[in-house]
Amino acid sequence: MRVGVSESEDSDGHVIEDEDLEMARQIENERKEKRAQKLKEKREREGKPPPKKRPAKKRKASSSEEDDDDEEESPRKSSKKSRKRAKSESESDESDEEEDRKKSKSKKKVDQKKKEKSKKKRTTSSSEDEDSDEEREQKSKKKSKKTKKQTSSESSEESEEERKVKKSKKNKEKSVKKRAETSEESDEDEKPSKKSKKGLKKKAKSESESESEDEKEVKKSKKKSKKVVKKESESEDEAPEKKKTEKRKRSKTSSEESSESEKSDEEEEEKESSPKPKKKKPLAVKKLSSDEESEESDVEVLPQKKKRGAVTLISDSEDEKDQKSESEASDVEEKVSKKKAKKQESSESGSDSSEGSITVNRKSKKKEKPEKKKKGIIMDSSKLQKETIDAERAEKERRKRLEKKQKEFNGIVLEEGEDLTEMLTGTSSQRKLKSVVLDPDSSTVDEESKKPVEVHNSLVRILKPHQAHGIQFMYDCACESLDRLDTEGSGGILAHCMGLGKTLQVITFLHTVLMHEKIGEKCKRVLVVVPKNVIINWFKEFQKWLVDNDEELDTIDVNELDSYKTIEDRRRALKAWHSSKTPSVMIIGYDLFRILTVEDDPKKKKPKNRNRRLEKAKEDFRKYLQNPGPDMVVCDEAHKLKNDDSALSKCMVKILTKRRICLTGTPLQNNLMEYHCMVNFVKPGLLGTKTEFANRFVNIINRGRTKDASPLEVSFMKRRCHVLYDHLKKCVDRKDYRVLTEAIPPKQEYVINVRQTERQCALYNAFLNDIVGDSGLSKRLLPDYHMFSRIWTHPYQLVLHEQRMERERVMREDAEEEADFIDDGDGSESESEGSFKSGSESDSGKSVVLSSDDEGSSKKKKNGNKPEIKKTAPQKKRKFLNSDDEDEEDGEDTAMAILQDGIRQSKRLAGEEADLRDTDTPPEYTGWFARLGLVKEEDRDDFALSNKLILLVEIIKKCEEIGDKLLVFSQSLESLTLIKRMLEYMAGTGQWFADGHEALNAEGEETWSWLEGEDYMTIDGSVQSGKRDAVQTSFNDPLNLRARLMLISTRAGSLGTNMVAANRVIIFDACWNPSHDTQSLFRVYRFGQTKPVYIYRFIAQGTMEERIYKRQVTKESTSMRVVDEAQIQRHYLGNDLTELYQFTPSTFDPDVEISCAPPKDRLLADVIHKNQHAVVDYIEHDTLFANVEDEKLTEQEMKDAWTDYEKDKSGMPVRAQYAAPPMPGFPNGMIVGQNVQALLQNRMNQGIRVDQMQHDILFKELQKMRIKDAGTAVKIVLLRNLLEQILPYIPDEMRGGMSEFNTHFIRLVHETDRKMETPADLLRKSLESFKTVIKMVKMIPTCREPLARMTRDYPYLFA
């Protein structure tokens, strides 16, 4: 089996290799060794004795000393009882003297035993005629019990007679083999055993002829007695068959030749097996006798389930050993009979003692027997489902067609010539597009009749190159070519980073395909499913880019369903859209789509208050939205489809069309299985089932992505990541924010570890000791998390929460009393249409609460009964963090993450009480802090008790001073309410401007305060979508300078909103799901941003929040590995979840300075310097996820990941330590070089003073470099100023969209600092940029005069 592109048709679509299977086995062996070593160390630490070795291993060793061949050919494992008896037997058979004594003793009693056995037989047969079946079973049970007692008290010896009984059993087994040999069911694997059966039979005959007369008689008597025992243990339905068998066998009295008895046995068994299946015989054991007999002894190998059975040594013994053998057969008989069919296929010949024969038989048996799945072994392609194989083959064929098309045609054409931007950057990323042709219509022969799929010129001029490639990707996925319009098409994921213009790409793509003559016939109706809070934004974007851009583009009917409030209105709107003859687009929210199409669960009782009008209209809704539904569907923020078991995903997959386009900026959220759900929506079966995907990718990547992974696991992970990335590269188009760095100012992210105050530490420890207990892990993780979050936010939050809970409890009791007094009926028929409005998507399904842990009406009653849920109360599932969630699945992110990672759950997490809040505060939590006296009423307005609030206030004041707008994201509405109250309190008491700072943008004598709607704005779940758009527009208004702060709930405002007016973001608390925080920061870092962006993440140091952030780091690393194929440093250990409850605060020592260098952000540096008691340290977030070049696979290694010819080399990346190299030409920071005095004089003539430079943005960035030089900074600022002077004289068509040079030089500064280059390198790059521009514009007439002036003032720059 080969991987990747293979010439063989059989290997199409294969992504797993044979060498990978071997590597997986090696990893599993390493993991087993590690587990054994850890267990041993744990026992040593606890003082426990080492575990005793199993006797089976000793038996194996002893048998190997006696006979190596017998050890290799040991019989299969029997029942546990047989093994226990075999243990005692094998311990006393070592010495030769005992064996001689046993032989002599057994010969004396041969005749006596023969008489006793015949007597027992007659007694048993007579009792069968007289007694009933029930009495017969009771006797057999008593006899077996008696036999067991006797064998347990006997010594561990075995007689010569029992060995002969084993030989008779072996002869029977040979007859079975002979019969199986002639059957039609035999396959190729049994051929070796067939060839050996004749030899085995001949050898058995020769051995039987050499037996003495006494041995033959003993064998005959043993055989008869054994059959009697079997007959007694048989069930009623098998008794007649056994009687018939025993009569036939007893009639055979001749014992002269054992071959004769063998033939008769064979004939009898064939007769018995013809009408009905043969009863399976008990498991046999290996025979070992005296030295001369052991050479001729036969070995019988029987099938096993798991491992080789223990080697059983049998020697001469007393008379009781015969009874023991009989009882063993009786015990095993019933179990073995259930598997008789299996034995007929896998049983083997046991007379050949050669090693080769046994080996062949074992191999053939392993092939015949279905293997149990082993942990850590990758699935072979033969184990995959047919759907998976077909999907992989179809995708491979599509990729071949696309590669051929790309070689023959490239429809994305850039304008000829070079503009200013391209000359400076050295790339074509900023060059304007000349034309974008998606399909040349090559199938049409007539040139005049060809209708290429081409983007309209009015749209081409506003597109960027990466957006043109995204449009081409969507066309290749949904349509592929005009020749394949009759096929069902397929889908793809446009996984462009937030801010790269995915909405514009979709609008351009839809306009292009809908207005095409051929495609428009097949695709007229498009459904765009988006989050509720961006419905209006999408509608406005269609108007902006189509209607407002060019009247010729206004050819598509665009409508949104949210504006229709009643069921009937929505039905009419969908009917008009579905039956439209012109191209039309319908925009709908995820929640409304689910409500209109969800099917009732037949297992659940229908609610009495359900909307009957909606139930009647659902049939039409499903027709319009699902089957036949739209011709194409577009899903924005498609990571909402992360759980294929959710109601939303179940509704979405029922859409009939396969032309599905998914948009997401964060394709990977909590785990790889969520990624699988999204890919499976657009490409069903491509990644296989969940089990197949987990086996082939998830398990391997998860093992190797942590720092405690072995080198082999890391190597295997890298290979799997590359295979997964390459496997999906034609259906997932990923572009990260590096595209933004070439077009907008840079971004800096900082993680600030905030120190806990003494009061917070005392409360945290008290809660750990008194409430959580000594177990270390509470059974109520989510309630504990919320309690901790209140502590690290502000201690008084505990009191406010309890007060709100008490108020709600009283209101709930009053409502229950009123409900008991007034009977309103079920309300099923009286429900008005007006109740089913757009608010039903979220407002009627949720109650707006202040935080996720607000219990509301879902508190548990004391009697244990489920509380009645009011109409306005949430339905069954409530939100985890706040009421801002846009669908019911988002609220379960945390709970699902904890469940998947093995954290202990309470009953409420396990879903036993699904109608109750997952985050209900347990009764023992109520008022626990009041007993300690750590929280007082006067703490309400003491905001110094929280260092997070102190840092927040300082950053807001600094932003006021420099004129920057700020966004504050929090996942808890409690925190947002606290921030509001703090700002209003400080403004009302005159504390805000008491420190003397001034707002830069305050006009004249205008006094700013903190009034909602004027000074700050809020977006949370209670703000309707229409109002959100108005708030966003007002905040982004460049003339509205007073609105300088926006408070946003993480989930309500992190999706799809545009806040480019702000350039600083504070993420107040870390979220379990990293995608929410990532979405938040990209509200400001997107196209349209004109200032450098600064992100500050507040993390409560030493707390559970710090551990949550570490989980985010691991998840983002996985996302970049799989989606971007970036090799990221493996972050933290794999067992971090077990450390969630550890509290390791850092105490403040005023004599010890903060252990970190000043950040490049001057604002943050000032804040940290002023508040060192509040900050432990900081880290740059982007540095954690910088692409580690050392871990990248080379081109050859990428091939090896597919062909598996050799293993990858692994190694931990080592970050280069900072060491400033000597800078020749710049000693002691002084400017040295040609015409230095002239440079200084010209600088003075232009009025450039040092005090003015201190406020220059470029100069500030130069001073933040880790390797900096003042002289070089002055030179670079001068070059920038000269280019700014000549820019107005450059024609607009040559600028390439460049309006200033500041951004270009700042990008050079950051690039140089990131690569740890010297200031000399930066100066060289700056001079190259300067000369490039001068060379480009020197022939332009308008530029001649300013260039002549520069030449006179700075001749050395033009030399």
Curated annotation (Swiss-Prot):
Record GO terms (molecular function): ATP binding; ATP hydrolysis activity; ATP-dependent chromatin remodeler activity; DNA binding; helicase activity; transcription coregulator activity
Sequence ranges of Basic residues compositional bias: 50-61, 77-86, 103-123, 139-149, 165-177, 194-204, 219-229, 362-376
Phenotype of null mutants: Temperature-sensitive with 38% embryonic lethality at 25 degrees Celsius. A large proportion of surviving animals are sterile. Surviving animals also have gonad developmental defects such as defective gonadal arm growth and as a result irregular distal tip cell migration, and 24% of animals had a protruding vulva phenotype. Reduced brood size. Double knockout with lin-35 results in 43% embryonic lethality.
Residue interval(s) of motif DEAH box: 636-639
Ranges of biased composition (kind: Acidic residues): 64-73, 257-271, 814-832
GO cellular component, one term: nucleus
One of the Pfam families matching this protein, by short name: Helicase_C
InterPro entries reported for this sequence: ARIP4-like (IPR044574), Helicase_ATP-bd (IPR014001), Helicase_C-like (IPR001650), P-loop_NTPase (IPR027417), SNF2-like_sf (IPR038718), SNF2/RAD54-like_C (IPR049730), SNF2_N (IPR000330)
SUPFAM superfamilies cross-referenced by the UniProt entry: P-loop containing nucleoside triphosphate hydrolases (SSF52540)
Keyword Mitochondrion: no
Signal peptide: none
Record field: compositional bias (Low complexity): 347-357, 833-847
Domain Helicase C-terminal: from-to ranges: 951-1134
Enzyme class: hydrolase
Primary localisation category: nucleus
Compartment(s) where it occurs, according to its Swiss-Prot or TrEMBL record: Nucleus
Catalytic activity annotation: ATP + H2O = ADP + phosphate + H(+)
Family the UniProt entry places it in: Belongs to the SNF2/RAD54 helicase family.
PANTHER family noted in UniProt: RAD54-LIKE (PTHR45797), TRANSCRIPTIONAL REGULATOR ATRX HOMOLOG (PTHR45797:SF3)
Protein name as catalogued: Transcriptional regulator ATRX homolog
